[in-house]
Amino acid sequence: MLISQRPTLSEDVLTDNRSQFVIEPLEPGFGYTLGNSLRRTLLSSIPGAAVTSIRIDGVLHEFTTVPGVKEDVTEIILNLKSLVVSSEEDEPVTMYLRKQGPGEVTAGDIVPPAGVTVHNPGMHIATLNDKGKLEVELVVERGRGYVPAVQNRASGAEIGRIPVDSIYSPVLKVTYKVDATRVEQRTDFDKLILDVETKNSISPRDALASAGKTLVELFGLARELNVEAEGIEIGPSPAEADHIASFALPIDDLDLTVRSYNCLKREGVHTVGELVARTESDLLDIRNFGQKSIDEVKIKLHQLGLSLKDSPPSFDPSEVAGYDVATGTWSTEGAYDEQDYAETEQL
């Protein structure tokens, strides 16, 4: 079985709606394979929301004008196609726009229902004069890709209901390039640099995660043909490899106090790997193993980048009473008493 080093993925946030992702190292040729697949999926298959039809008070079709409104109905529809919305509802929802002149009508004048958000409230829709009045009913639906107005034309729709071209994709632009990168003595590995720009309705990070999930589901169809088929197996990342090496260390290397060390040895915990498999509750069940011993173990594991099974990843040694992070020592007030340093039981 061929084992490849696990690639890492990093994100460089450029703006609120644009990020650059770097995936490396990839086996030669896989930069283009992965980059092209992700780009296509990001542009065509990320679910989003869009306006599918509108109804303007006093208007029967799009080839007309509204009294007191500078733009004709066709221009208003073109503007509404640029509306950026998100919806948490699977079913169609209705938004309303009511504005009386004079003044500019923007997307911020739209009143969305609960679960629907307008992300570009400053977008221009129309301009009203002193006598202008605009009342619009907008239907928003969820979907993928691009759907032309002719497909949004519902049979039996009421007179005056105007279908609109729907651009569901929340992704504006995706580009990628592949550079060479070095792994040990080899310099022919690929580094994929993916630039993702989205609308404000979704972050680039979430868009990439959605694309990855879609591809995993689709490629899983081929995998199911023979789950035992041989392929390239992704090995651990350098950080994971360091953790694996740490698991084999004897607890002697943690330099624990005698009490903590003896308690763990008596319980049959001989390696770091066996220790991180325990929870705080498991350790507290050990005779003579108290909260101070728990704190000591958590600090020692934190220094290796590890933690107990149920410890939160945000553990901060500086918050442990009596422990000085700078010197790695315990103050008198928070220190272990003498019996913690005296061997309490012969093993």
UniProtKB/Swiss-Prot annotation:
<dbReference type="GO" id="GO:0005829">
    <property type="term" value="C:cytosol"/>
</dbReference>
<keyword id="KW-0548">Nucleotidyltransferase</keyword>
<protein>
    <recommendedName>
        <fullName>DNA-directed RNA polymerase subunit alpha</fullName>
        <ecNumber>2.7.7.6</ecNumber>
    </recommendedName>
</protein>
<dbReference type="GO" id="GO:0006351">
    <property type="term" value="P:DNA-templated transcription"/>
</dbReference>
<dbReference type="GO" id="GO:0003677">
    <property type="term" value="F:DNA binding"/>
</dbReference>
<dbReference type="GO" id="GO:0005886">
    <property type="term" value="C:plasma membrane"/>
</dbReference>
<keyword id="KW-0808">Transferase</keyword>
<dbReference type="InterPro" id="IPR036643">
    <property type="entry name" value="RNApol_insert_sf"/>
</dbReference>
<keyword id="KW-0804">Transcription</keyword>
<comment type="function">
    <text>DNA-dependent RNA polymerase catalyzes the transcription of DNA into RNA using the four ribonucleoside triphosphates as substrates.</text>
</comment>
<dbReference type="InterPro" id="IPR011262">
    <property type="entry name" value="DNA-dir_RNA_pol_insert"/>
</dbReference>
<dbReference type="InterPro" id="IPR011263">
    <property type="entry name" value="DNA-dir_RNA_pol_RpoA/D/Rpb3"/>
</dbReference>
<dbReference type="GO" id="GO:0005737">
    <property type="term" value="C:cytoplasm"/>
</dbReference>
<dbReference type="Pfam" id="PF01193">
    <property type="entry name" value="RNA_pol_L"/>
</dbReference>
<dbReference type="InterPro" id="IPR011260">
    <property type="entry name" value="RNAP_asu_C"/>
</dbReference>
<dbReference type="InterPro" id="IPR036603">
    <property type="entry name" value="RBP11-like"/>
</dbReference>
<dbReference type="GO" id="GO:0000428">
    <property type="term" value="C:DNA-directed RNA polymerase complex"/>
</dbReference>
<dbReference type="Pfam" id="PF01000">
    <property type="entry name" value="RNA_pol_A_bac"/>
</dbReference>
<dbReference type="GO" id="GO:0046983">
    <property type="term" value="F:protein dimerization activity"/>
</dbReference>
<dbReference type="Pfam" id="PF03118">
    <property type="entry name" value="RNA_pol_A_CTD"/>
</dbReference>
<dbReference type="GO" id="GO:0003899">
    <property type="term" value="F:DNA-directed RNA polymerase activity"/>
</dbReference>
<feature type="region of interest" description="Alpha N-terminal domain (alpha-NTD)">
    <location>
        <begin position="1"/>
        <end position="226"/>
    </location>
</feature>
<comment type="subunit">
    <text>Homodimer. The RNAP catalytic core consists of 2 alpha, 1 beta, 1 beta' and 1 omega subunit. When a sigma factor is associated with the core the holoenzyme is formed, which can initiate transcription.</text>
</comment>
<comment type="similarity">
    <text>Belongs to the RNA polymerase alpha chain family.</text>
</comment>
<feature type="region of interest" description="Alpha C-terminal domain (alpha-CTD)">
    <location>
        <begin position="243"/>
        <end position="347"/>
    </location>
</feature>
<dbReference type="InterPro" id="IPR011773">
    <property type="entry name" value="DNA-dir_RpoA"/>
</dbReference>
<dbReference type="GO" id="GO:0009274">
    <property type="term" value="C:peptidoglycan-based cell wall"/>
</dbReference>
<keyword id="KW-0240">DNA-directed RNA polymerase</keyword>
